Regions:
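N-terminal FAD cofactor-binding segment of flavoenzymes
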Residues: 47-85
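Glycine-rich FAD pyrophosphate-binding loop
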Residues: 26-49
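Conserved Rossmann-like nucleotide-cofactor binding loop
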Residues: 17, 40, 166
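N-terminal Rossmann-like FAD-binding beta1-loop-alpha1 element of flavoenzymes
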Residues: 8-34
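FAD/FMN-dependent oxidoreductases across multiple families
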Residues: 233-325
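C-terminal helical "tail/cap" subdomain of flavin- and related membrane-associated enzymes
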Residues: 312-403
């Protein structure tokens, strides 16, 4: 085997989480090698699949600190309005009740990927190897030794799995998962609308699943329509005009006339959680560690919190002259993330089952709950601060501080 690369950390997966992990380590001078079997597109900002990401306030601070924030493409979320089907009761979150900052921002994934790739490729501490997957990886007390599918290989002090919900690294390490399907599929698209959205995000709970209208820059909005699996193929076969008509049936005319402004995509919705997020010289971040329903729009934010926590531990150990891939540091990472991951997954799962249930007594109870919470400003402020990520102390990067 020809050793082509030696670095302190090897990262499997060159998606958003993998590149964010590499750039975060680079900010403290730690060299990494990022590996992905897929090639990175040359100009990904021109490639749109309609997918967007909600970025919380603290996640934005982290991305700004790392130079990863594409501000020109980000739309602030100032208000959130939650309704349950045709009920007149609603829950309204106004960002001014929690401070002067937006509750979050919405941005198309293509712009995040473009910025992440640009910054990573410009770094001298980051080597990106694409087009060849990892065919073999060994972990022992001396470090990590890996072989790529082209026969080349390398060494590192530790390996980080950022290779998604079907993580090869997680499976090869023998880390089991638990989870289930929600029997729903998310249909994603971007619309152009006639009337201004005023940076208000809408989420309407329908029997088939939540229906979200999320503000993008200008006269555009992102649709995330979760629906029963059986109905999705029928909807996806409709032409654009008919599909837009189905969108209006499930929302209202507050945005005026609408039209599709790009391709549609879909993906099945499920919950998956790894039984462990660390092992011998190994750590998992992002979807490789946990995958959730998009009902709360927190999946990527949870992954960024993984990255911020893990990077802080790695950097602190390196400065102390300790082994960055040692068991003590990885145990600390495991402990630091346990409560946050478990709490958010449980809350998201509970909301999904509760609001996808059309049994009349359940529907009446949740409608009354929405109306009641809407009249409790302190509770609403607590919910907003939790969603913004400002409740409690977190890793330095989430507070806008450099490593």
């Amino acid at each position: 085997m020809q050793t082509v690369m030696q670095s302190e950390v090897v990262i499997v997966g060159a998606g958003l989480s993998g590149l964010a992990m590499a750039v975060t380590l680079d900010s403290a001078g730690i060299a990494s090698t990022v590996i992905d079997r897929q090639h990175l597109p040359a100009d990904i900002s021109d490639i749109s699949d309609g997918r967007t990401t909600a970025i919380s306030y603290t996640s934005r601070r982290m991305l700004e600190t790392l130079g990863l924030w594409p501000a020109e493409h980000a739309a602030p979320i100032l208000d959130i309005r939650v309704t349950d089907g045709p009920s007149r009761l609603f829950l309204h979150f106004d960002h001014r009740d929690a401070g002067d900052q937006p509750m979050g921002h919405l941005i198309e994934n293509r712009f995040l990927r473009a910025r992440f790739q640009q910054v990573a490729k410009q770094s001298r501490n980051i080597t990106i190897l694409t087009g060849h997957g990892v065919s073999d990886l060994q972990r022992d007390e001396t470090g990590v030794h890996y072989t790529l599918s082209d026969g080349s290989g390398g060494q590192a002090r530790m390996v980080i799995g950022a290779d998604g919900a079907k993580s090869w690294l997680r499976q090869s390490a023998g880390i089991r998962t638990s989870g289930w399907s929600y029997g729903q599929t998310a249909m994603i698209c971007t619309i152009r609308h006639q009337l201004p959205h005023h940076n208000v995000a809408h989420e309407r709970f329908l029997p088939g699943g939540p229906f979200a209208v999320l503000p993008l820059a200008g006269e555009y909005a992102s649709i995330v329509w979760s629906e029963r699996d059986a109905l999705v193929p029928v909807m996806m076969r409709l032409d654009d005009q008919a599909f837009a008509g189905e969108l209006l049936r499930r929302f209202d005319d507050s945005l005026g006339t609408i039209e599709l402004a790009g391709p549609r995509s879909s993906y099945p919705l499920s919950l998956t959680v790894a039984h462990d997020i660390a092992g011998t010289r190994l750590a998992l971040v992002g979807d490789a560690a946990h995958q959730m329903h998009p009902i709360a729009g927190q999946a990527f934010n949870l992954g960024l919190r993984d990255i911020a926590a893990l990077a802080e531990i790695i950097v602190d150990r390196r400065r102390l002259g300790l082994d960055i891939g040692g068991d003590e540091g990885l145990s600390r990472y495991r402990r630091s993330r346990r409560v946050d991951i478990a709490t958010l997954l449980a809350a998201t799962d509970g909301l999904t089952w509760l609001f996808s249930n059309d049994i009349p007594p359940v529907r009446i109870a949740r409608d009354l709950s929405l109306g009641l919470v809407n009249k409790m400003p302190r509770l609403k402020t607590m919910f907003m601060r939790s969603a913004m990520g400002t409740a409690g102390n977190g890793p330095r990067l989430l507070r806008g501080q450099h490593l």
